[in-house]
Amino acid sequence: MKECLFCTKELKTGEHFIDLIIMNQQEEWICKECKEDFEQIGEIHCPRCYKDKEEKVCKDCEYWIQKGNMVEHEALYRYNTAMKDYFKRYKFEGDRLLGMVFACDIKKALKKYKSYTIIPTPISHEKNQERGFNQVSTILDFAEIKYNNLFQKEDTLAQSKKTREERLKTSQHF
């Protein structure tokens, strides 16, 4: 019996005939109810950071552009309560298996970048010792995506421990 990694309800693994024909072997790690709690970014979003429901460049991106920083992010999901809980459990409580939840989505999203060199966001040695894994490279591993660790990060105060204002003033530490 396989359980949802979020709510621990039993996962129903009924395969559909069409999945067998097209050899769709996407494994489910969370139940349908939990998956529905994650909101995909809609068609209307900031063209720079993918902030949902922004029809043009958002104020945050305008701020960074005025400072000479080009913003080009691509988000798949909104940062809602479900996503906040996901990151809390995945990053801060060390539930490494949760890296499998979005591996398939990441793999699909990165297909158009197959000629690129993927470089995961580094974490400090101290954070790696504490957590036991790098959250970005773990998802890439589960998605079977090749990457290069080209950067190292200095030991500094975690972004999650800073206020928004402090994060905006922070320079890059890798």
Language model region names:
Residues 1-174:
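Glycine-rich phosphate/pyrophosphate-handling loop used in enzymes and phosphotransfer proteins
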